[in-house]
Amino acid sequence: MTLKMPKNNCFKTKLILSALAFTALISSCTIGGLTSDYNKLTAKEKQRVVKSFGDIDQLKADNTIYLVEVQQVKDYCNKHQQVVIYDYTPNCGSSACMQVNDFVDMCKANGTNPLVIGNSFWGLADTRKLGIPLLMIDPQPLGTKWRSRYIRLFFKELIDSNSPNPPEELYFSFQNGKYIGNFRSCKEALQALNIKDVKTL
């Protein structure tokens, strides 16, 4: 004998399963909130956030979190032969994300300048010293408080893109100031710079 489940129960079951699947997806990568999450910082952590001006090379590699604008990053890329930028989301558990210290070490091992640019304050203050300045997108000049929008605007302006589709990956390669591409892994970003036998960690 086959029991038929009432249609309403079927719908409720599907709804519950969909909700569980969505929850699992969200918890697989902690992506921060709708805004920069600045208000989640403690008073002491907020004191570490500083608006930067001018040359990124002049910033200290201490526990300061430096707010940066697009032009500062462009100027940095123009000064250095090879740069890989990590669009860094603290606490991210996605397979595309890597430990930020590993990213810095891997770039340096391959003769490339690493730049870590955070897109959320949530967890950024817990980042260990990297040996390079810790940067954070400054949302104010982009004219929006919404995180997804300021990330999109920042990187579209950085790569001089007129495409309606924003870059989707986390790693950006530049050579002598020229944008090379947007990649899913640090290794791919380094390979795009014509580095043979990329050293991995």
Predicted regions, residues:
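N-terminal secretory signal peptides that target proteins for export/translocation
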Residues: M1-K12
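C-terminal motif of bacterial Sec signal peptides marking the signal peptidase cleavage site
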Residues: L25-S28
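Post-signal peptide N-terminal segment of mature Sec-exported envelope proteins
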Residues: Y38-L59
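Short, internal strand/loop/helix patches
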Residues: K129-E168
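A short, hydrophobic beta-strand/beta-hairpin element that forms part of a small beta-sheet core
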Residues: N165-N182
